[in-house]
Amino acid sequence: MDKQWLVNKTNPEYISYFAKKNSVSAILAQILINRGLKTPEEVRSFLKPDRTQMSDPFDLPDMQKAVQRIRTASERGETVLVHGDYDADGLTATTIVVKALKMLGIGCDFFIPNRMAHGYGFTRASVREAKRRGASLIITVDCGITSFEAVSQSKREGIDVIITDHHEPKKIQLSAPEGTPTKTEQIQQQEFTLPAAFAVVNPKILIHSPAVNLSGAGVALKLAQALFIDRGSEDIMSHFLDLAALGTIADVVPLTGENRMIVKEGLDMIGHGTNTGLLALKRVAGIKGKYLKPGKLLFSVIPRINAPGRISDAHSVINLLSTDSEDEAMNIALWLDQQNSERQRIEETVYQEALTVLEQKGITPFIVLSAEGWHKGVIGIVASRIAETFSRPVIILSVEGDTARGSARSIPSLDIYYALSACRDCLSRFGGHKQAAGLELRSKDIPFFEDSLNRVVVDLLSDQDFTPALHIDSHIDLCNVSFRLLKEFEMLEPFGTGNPEPLLGSKSLEVVDARIVGNGHLKMKLKQKKNVIDAIGFDLASYMATLESSYKIDAVFTPFINEWNGSRHLSLNLKALRPSTEN
């Protein structure tokens, strides 16, 4: 699919001023400006994140109440149940809170819902489980912010609930779905309606919180930090940053602000191997070396952590992340590897079936696909793949009798949580973020729901919004692609959502020795005046015809250092190319 080429442009005089003020190159200055940085203090914090930049955990709403209630539970010897979620963010968040409580001598147990048996989130089934275990206090992590019924049931059972979550709260101005408790059972804070829990700790309740983009594991880290401060100890990050980094990367939250520090320091901890379970998982995933990047974890360790929660039971992941036994860790890691292979098989089957349904229905502004028997554990991944392929928001629904449960994935131009909110009369329940959500509705309502979503999207988006865009950070001549520049780019790491790897563009390039290699990849040399550099375009073999019919090309790329047999040379990772506009 062709993409829009959008070049960020700034007044050259301001770039020169900014570069001099911050002692960086003009290209890095342009990138930092693109990232929204304005002052030397902001630049310094971005390039050199450290723990001093962490905000006070007690600035989060209800944190003081939460800590006091946990302290009371400890003093009374109450049974505390930590209720997590079955994805990597929820599992790492659960491990953080359980580990913190045990380090403080507070007895606790944990519960991870089974996707098939219990469904998603904090539910009535969760309350029944807490009652069975004799818990008088439930701490939710990475879930609970829209669990009105479960919180109300907990109160009736005499069980207090502390919610720690980072998902979107329910907005007051939206009409309430059937089954939502009355206003007397709810608490209103700012523009949101919250469950009537003992405490609700969620940075999204605050409009201007510096912690607003924390993952579930990030919020759990804040709770752990607050608990230790309450006990007179503040330096506890070394116990939890590796887990918090994993959860942050897994949930694809912006790697800016506090998340940047969490991931940067956490990656270093993961790389140097202090967690027995993660060491085993790295070995099974084939990860070597101490220098890790988020992308490597996203495609190796994290899918294995996610796998059991998708197709079976995720409790063993907590054991893996908590154990000091190398034998136990390796046994669990090998089992996770098997689970991931099975997940891949199931996912591919559902993906191919979904493509068949899409071919029969045709592409609409908002793609909604449904069928009986699709495995609920993989429909989120399938939705992501179809959304990326067709540049459309996508919902994949698994139908079981009268009920359909699904996962939604969006494109950058659409807030999918807003779109679902506009159609909430069709839904039994839903929750999530701007780019991803989960939902449930009656099977018979699917056609009307699909029609409603498409009307919403047509009103909100233009044709251009459905065309994926390449946001080019800066134009560059090949003579300026250097080892020194790439060394400077290292200061921008870690890369991820909100801080992508720098994307550069160059014009009027001669193509030398272009050929297709491997499974649909494009390899060549690019020449500009006297400068020649190797280039590789993964999955870009379809551009071969463009190269053969063009005298010169324009290219978008990320530069990198190719290391092979002890040698290092500069190369370009091509993202797109076109006939040159300067021919």
How should each PLM-predicted stretch be described?
Residues 2, 8-137, 157-158, 173-178, ...:
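Hydrophobic helix-and-loop "lid/oligomerization" segment in the mid-to-C-terminal part
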Residues 71-72, 188-202, 526-531:
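Acidic-glycine-rich active-site phosphate/pyrophosphate-binding loop
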Residues 128-174, 191-217, 221-230, 239, ...:
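Active-site cavity-forming subdomains of large catalytic enzyme subunits
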Residues 404, 437, 520-524, 568-570:
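Short beta-strand micro-motifs in enzyme catalytic cores
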Residues 445-450, 543, 549-583:
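OB-fold single-stranded nucleic acid-binding module
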Residues 474-533:
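Accessory interdomain/linker segments of ATP-dependent helicases and helicase-like nucleic-acid enzymes
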Residues 476-478, 493, 539, 559-561, ...:
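Beta-strand elements of well-folded, non-transmembrane domains
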Residues 530-546:
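Beta-strand/loop nucleic-acid-binding surfaces
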